[in-house]
């Protein structure tokens, strides 16, 4: 089995957010949607940029939005009673690596567009888990902790591709 590429980053973000006050689920999901809008814009712009100095600027901006998603997922999980969000993110990546070999968001398989859709879908699942009828026959029956964990793990996996404003692969 492949080793999770973001163990150290997950621990770093957990440490950095240790004393943060959690915000409401509404605020978190809203911030994620804002970040998704910025990420989609960055993906489009990065795809059309030929100048290296501009690519670095947008890659760093892109990285900041992914960090925002991760740190908010970390705080949300803590507020939901998860003691070690970093371990939860790593365990989720390990499950995904088995279920989707070569297609976790750190791999070269998916494009940034596909990565975006995967992250957006999971943010939507978190929102679905918070609806009034989630646990009813008319709802999605989504587990909020599991869905928030997937959001954080996906963002971390994608984030390892953008270290210091540089893409790990030209296969976007």
Give residue spans per PLM region:
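Flexible "arm" and connector segments at domain edges
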Residues: 1-172
